[in-house]
Regions:
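Phosphate-binding site recognition
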Residues: 1-291
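A cross-kingdom feature that marks ATP-driven nucleic-acid transaction machinery
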Residues: 255, 262-389
Length: 389
């Protein structure tokens, strides 16, 4: 055996041992020998299920990418055979597989063209908490955050329960962020770990994300290809699709100046926070409370709040009593010298051939519109109407 072959074999034996222990936990005889292959493992699973009678049974394979190990083809092939040859014919069996490594699940399960091809009954993607759900989470756990602080926490951590669980209710939000990110970083390696866990060849994905982090309003496919020194071909398309499927980036049309371009924008809150404050030793020497008065904070907060709003479009629809939305995009009325008006969010509602123009501002206090600001808004509306003729 080569060194890597021995390593892969040892990994498979360890995963088979975990699988075997689970079968024992759910009633398999302790006299049953441990399987030496995934074919034997699924044969034992079938025997266990057959001995459980006719009641409804759920087979739940958690973290399938981890279970499969480096040589995943054997497990996937045997899982497909287990399902196609027997399990799919049993009306009382539900098979659930899940995994946090998004690209692996897409390539080996959802887009798999072998035994699992077109076998999925339902796909379920776990989404972060909404802003309202975060508010309820904090309320239930005796946090006394204002809505401004709840929004700020969301902009730093996203609606991810794992990150939210790091917060303590005996600290202010500023103290929590200092402790988690800066003073004693509990998630110092989280950025690298997240991408390594989600994607194979994670360094290529990180390169794309870092470049997108430098361009707050997104980049075209060609701009991304040039920045990461690759071609705008199938490999880049797959990576961009995987990033979008994971909720890390989004795509939207940018209209303006008589042209329409599709751009990719980084929208993962944790990645945005990390790249703005921690990437390449950016960690500030002052506390988070003092940092909130800096130009760096206002630049980050303004952009991130726009993303927060765009990710809560359904709640915005309800507040504005808008029906079905048919389009949503950023508009820039570019002039020849590159300057021009910008509208943060345009919501199209074709039910009444109406466009909602949204100016998004992040402010701790009520944002007052003075005469000059009002005129600037009216000028944007005029430029938008002229552009849409």
């Amino acid at each position: 055996f080569k060194k890597e072959d021995r390593s892969d074999l040892r990994c498979r034996q360890e995963q088979l041992a975990h699988f075997y222990e689970s079968l024992l936990q759910y009633g398999m005889s302790v006299e049953t020998p441990m399987p030496n292959s995934w074919r034997e493992a699924f044969r034992l699973l079938r025997q266990l299920l057959e001995n459980c009678g006719k009641r409804r049974k759920v087979v739940f394979l958690d973290e399938l990418p981890w279970l499969a190990g480096p040589q995943s083809s054997e497990l996937i092939a045997e899982l497909g055979f287990f399902w196609n040859s027997w399990a799919c014919k049993q009306r009382n069996i539900i098979l659930v597989v899940c995994g946090s490594a998004t690209s692996w699940m897409l390539d080996n399960v959802i887009r798999e063209y072998g035994g699992l091809y077109s076998r999925l009954t339902m796909k379920m993607q776990l989404h972060p908490f909404t802003l309202g759900e975060c508010e309820q989470y904090y309320k239930d756990r005796d946090f006394h955050f204002s809505r401004y602080e709840i929004a700020l926490a969301y902009m730093a951590l996203g609606g991810i329960p794992y990150y939210m669980d790091l917060l303590r209710n005996d600290r202010t939000l500023a103290e929590n962020i200092d402790q988690i990110f800066f003073k004693n970083p509990q998630i110092k390696q989280e950025f690298e770990d997240v991408y390594m866990g989600l994607f194979s060849s994670s360094e290529k994905y990180v390169d794309i994300v870092v470049e997108l982090g430098k361009h707050k309003y997104g980049m075209t496919r060609k701009e991304i290809a040039d920045a990461v020194h690759t071609t705008s071909g199938g490999g880049l398309s797959t990576m961009l699709d995987n990033l979008q499927q994971s909720g890390i980036i989004t795509t939207y049309p940018r209209l303006g100046g008589k042209r329409k371009v599709m751009v990719y924008q980084l929208v993962d809150f944790f990645s945005l926070f990390y790249l703005n404050y921690m990437h390449k030793h950016k960690t500030p020497t002052t506390g988070w409370g003092a940092l909130q008065r800096s130009p760096q904070f206002f630049a980050w907060a303004g952009l991130t709040f726009e993303i927060l709003v765009s990710q809560h479009i359904r709640q915005l629809q309800n507040a504005l009593r808008i029906g079905t939305v048919t389009g949503m995009y950023n508009w820039r009325g570019m002039t020849d010298d590159g300057d021009g008006s910008q509208i943060d969010l345009v919501i199209e509602w074709h039910g009444e051939r109406t466009d909602y123009l949204c100016e998004i501002k992040f402010s701790e206090n009520v944002f007052a519109i003075n005469a000059d600001y009002k005129q600037a808004l009216l000028d944007k509306i005029s430029a938008f109407r002229e552009d849409r003729k």
